């Protein structure tokens, strides 16, 4: 069995050793919930990694969005190169759920675009959880949505071992039952092909490796791992396990039982609709469901098959659907990152999903069982979650209640950096004073972040500062992902000195060059000026030893008082620690590589073209598809050098698209 092993030049420092010991002690004493209060720059991810290494338990890390999940995944991957670090988020690039608007009698069909790279990574995650214990899965909150039953998923695997006999037709049929497609021409992920005594399989969890099964009669002689593009043999395998090409694969017997259950529910529902004198809904439901039943009978699947998932999993009405949590072993560990955002998200998901599906059921578009194709209710998630460590700089009420208000603090940064000095100034002449502060900060060689309450004010302030010849930019929700990254890079490099935003200057904005954070209208109580928002925004100045925060306010609100008091408390603890240990705070010197993924793209893609691709996901997908065809064409023409070059370019584009999605 592989143990977790961190590969890093760093060792736990500051508050990290104490926090690691406290959390591990809590886990050993069977505490179900613990709270790790980690301030900006305290090394929360590194602390989590050390807890995982010491406890040696399979781990799920939940984040509140794909971007944060990708960031944690990247960090964990670099810390645990010898272990299985997996990424599990929604595989939709675009998703429009089916819906019915009764007011206008408008039915909206489900429309979606699946990201093949993310689908591959989801398969790799579930496979790792079923095959090994040294697994870290980094997930968004979408992991609470229904997934195929792990029992059926594992029951359907095909085990292959050299020296064993296999009936060829039966093996091919087994692959088809796993929803693999036979394709002797276009060999890609989720396909298999037959050539003489060889069967090639492109597993669902690989992007650049395939397996070649070499037979002598019915006996499997060899299993080789090979490069599907060049045909080069990479390794000889002692065994291979083929998992389903979908998480919803199931035996034919299960499909037959499900069809019977669907037919029974359909008859009951039709009788009910007739008794309610709803002929249109009756006819609509019968027609749609009968079509789905025909498809299930003929192919074992249908469009929207997930709406019948309760029948396939054998669950009763109202019971929770199988999710990623059922793939976790009993002794798994759960970290909920930025829990003050993640926990409310989990709480909200069920109600929104049910409201939409309830309308579909009432108007005859779906059977009532479709309501059971859903995310977990908050209470169900709370019941299923294993031992949990909530992680946040600003814990929410649920986490504090679960832990009895007890928190494990990460306040001392390994770098010795202090929480920024907080200054409160009148809001009456805030813009005039801000200009003076901007001049001072720029003269020191630092950058300025300014947060406003409204989009209009942000736009007007940006325009005004630009008129005064300050290098200013405005960060808002309409800025494309790539453009956002470029703006932040320009800010760090000094191309921009001042960045103005609204709610985009909180979690995850890492600017060591920032010497001043200015919060305008700080005394306007509300979501953007709550205690949590203020603490998170103040944290943006904590990467710089000279970092300051100015809160412009004409009155002292409860939120300002609490946020400033908490910042001062932390600052005093940090100062005392530094004095005791002779530490001089130094600004983090972090390399500017925000556009690394973008700049790695082959030189054939000029900057203007790449801008266009990343600004328009549809164009990017079209370009990726075009590259795939060119690569396969080059390979079929035996132009392997060109094919490999195209493959590398394609891989870079797909990775960049994944991180920028």
UniProtKB/Swiss-Prot annotation:
Stretches assigned to the Helicase C-terminal domain: 430-592
Domain Helicase ATP-binding per the UniProt entry, residue ranges: 25-182
Pfam families membership: Helicase_C (PF00271), ResIII (PF04851), UVR (PF02151), UvrB (PF12344), UvrB_inter (PF17757)
InterPro entries documented for this protein: Helicase/UvrB_N, Helicase_ATP-bd, Helicase_C-like, P-loop_NTPase, UVR_dom, UVR_dom_sf, UvrB, UvrB_inter
Annotated ATP binding sites: 38-45
Entry annotated with the keyword rRNA-binding: no
Signal peptide: none
Record keywords, A-Z: ATP-binding, Cytoplasm, DNA damage, DNA excision, DNA repair, Excision nuclease, Helicase, Hydrolase, Nucleotide-binding, SOS response
GO molecular function: ATP binding; ATP hydrolysis activity; DNA binding; excinuclease ABC activity; helicase activity
Record-level GO BP terms: nucleotide-excision repair; SOS response
Subcellular location: Cytoplasm
CDD domains named among the record's database cross-references: DEXHc_UvrB (cd17916), SF2_C_UvrB (cd18790)
Motif segment (Beta-hairpin): 91-114
Domain UVR: 621-656
GO cellular component: cytoplasm; excinuclease repair complex
The protein's assembly and partners: Forms a heterotetramer with UvrA during the search for lesions. Interacts with UvrC in an incision complex.
UniProt comment concerning the protein's domains: The beta-hairpin motif is involved in DNA binding.
Similarity comment: family membership: Belongs to the UvrB family.
Function description: The UvrABC repair system catalyzes the recognition and processing of DNA lesions. A damage recognition complex composed of 2 UvrA and 2 UvrB subunits scans DNA for abnormalities. Upon binding of the UvrA(2)B(2) complex to a putative damaged site, the DNA wraps around one UvrB monomer. DNA wrap is dependent on ATP binding by UvrB and probably causes local melting of the DNA helix, facilitating insertion of UvrB beta-hairpin between the DNA strands. Then UvrB probes one DNA strand for the presence of a lesion.
Name of protein: UvrABC system protein B
């Amino acid at each position: 069995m592989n143990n977790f092993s961190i590969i890093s030049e760093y060792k736990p420092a500051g508050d990290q050793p104490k926090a690691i010991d406290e959390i591990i002690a809590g886990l050993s004493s069977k505490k179900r919930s613990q709270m790790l209060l980690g301030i900006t720059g305290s090394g929360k991810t590194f602390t989590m990694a050390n807890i995982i290494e010491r406890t040696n338990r399979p781990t799920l890390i939940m984040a509140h969005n794909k971007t944060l999940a990708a960031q944690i995944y990247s960090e964990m991957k670099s810390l645990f190169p010898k272990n299985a670090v997996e990424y599990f988020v929604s595989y939709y690039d675009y998703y429009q759920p089916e819906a019915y608007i009764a007011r206008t009698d408008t039915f909206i069909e489900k429309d979606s675009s699946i990201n093949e790279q993310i689908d591959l990574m989801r398969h790799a995650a579930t496979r790792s959880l079923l095959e090994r214990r040294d697994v870290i899965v980094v997930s968004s909150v979408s992991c609470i949505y229904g997934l195929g039953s792990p029992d059926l998923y594992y029951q359907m695997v095909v085990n292959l071992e050299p020296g064993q006999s296999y009936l060829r037709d039966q093996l091919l049929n087994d692959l088809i039952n796993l929803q693999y497609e036979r394709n002797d021409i276009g060999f890609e992920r989720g396909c298999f092909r037959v050539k003489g005594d060889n069967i090639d399989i492109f597993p669902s969890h690989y992007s650049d490796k395939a397996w070649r099964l070499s037979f002598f009669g019915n006996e499997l002689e060899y299993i080789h791992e090979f490069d599907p593009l060049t045909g080069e043999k990479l390794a000889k395998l002692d065994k291979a396990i083929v998992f389903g090409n979908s998480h919803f694969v199931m035996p034919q017997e299960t499909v037959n039982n499900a069809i019977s259950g669907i037919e029974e529910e359909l008859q009951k529902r039709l009788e009910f609709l007739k008794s309610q004198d709803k002929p249109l809904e009756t006819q609509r439901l019968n027609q749609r469901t009968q079509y789905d039943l025909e498809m299930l009978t003929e192919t074992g699947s249908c469009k929207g098959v997930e709406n019948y998932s309760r029948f396939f999993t054998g669950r009763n009405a109202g019971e929770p659907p199988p999710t990623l949590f059922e793939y976790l072993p009993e002794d798994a560990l759960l970290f909920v990152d930025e829990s003050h955002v993640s926990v409310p998200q989990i709480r909200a998901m069920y109600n929104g999903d049910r409201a939409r599906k309830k309308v579909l059921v009432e108007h005859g578009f779906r059977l009532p069982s479709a309501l059971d194709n859903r995310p977990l209710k908050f209470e169900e998630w709370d019941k299923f979650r294993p031992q949990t460590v909530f992680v946040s700089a600003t814990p929410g009420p649920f986490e504090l209640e679960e832990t009895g208000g007890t928190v494990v603090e990460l306040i001392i940064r390994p770098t010795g950096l202090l929480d920024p000095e907080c200054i409160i100034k009148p809001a009456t002449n805030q813009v005039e004073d801000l200009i003076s502060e901007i001049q001072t900060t720029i003269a020191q060689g630092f950058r300025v972040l300014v947060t406003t309450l409204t989009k209009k004010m942000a736009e007007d302030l940006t325009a005004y500062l630009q008129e005064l010849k300050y290098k200013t930019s405005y960060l808002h929700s309409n800025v494309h992902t790539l453009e956002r990254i470029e703006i932040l890079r320009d800010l760090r490099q000094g191309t921009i000195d001042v960045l103005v935003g609204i709610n985009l200057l909180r979690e995850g904005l890492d600017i060591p060059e920032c010497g001043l954070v200015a919060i305008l209208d700080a005394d306007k109580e509300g979501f953007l000026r709550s205690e949590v928002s203020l603490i998170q925004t103040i944290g943006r100045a904590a990467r710089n030893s000279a970092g300051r925060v100015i809160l412009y306010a004409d009155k002292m609100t409860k939120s300002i008082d609490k946020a400033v008091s908490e910042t001062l408390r932390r600052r005093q603890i940090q100062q005392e620690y530094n004095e005791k240990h002779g530490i001089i705070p130094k600004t983090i010197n972090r390399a500017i590589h925000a556009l690394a993924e973008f700049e790695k793209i082959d030189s054939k893609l000029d900057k203007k073209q790449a801008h266009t691709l990343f600004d328009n996901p549809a164009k990017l997908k079209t370009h990726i598809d075009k590259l795939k065809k060119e690569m396969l064409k080059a390979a079929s023409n035996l132009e392997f050098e060109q094919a490999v070059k195209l493959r590398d370019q394609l891989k870079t584009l797909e990775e960049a698209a994944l991180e920028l999605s």
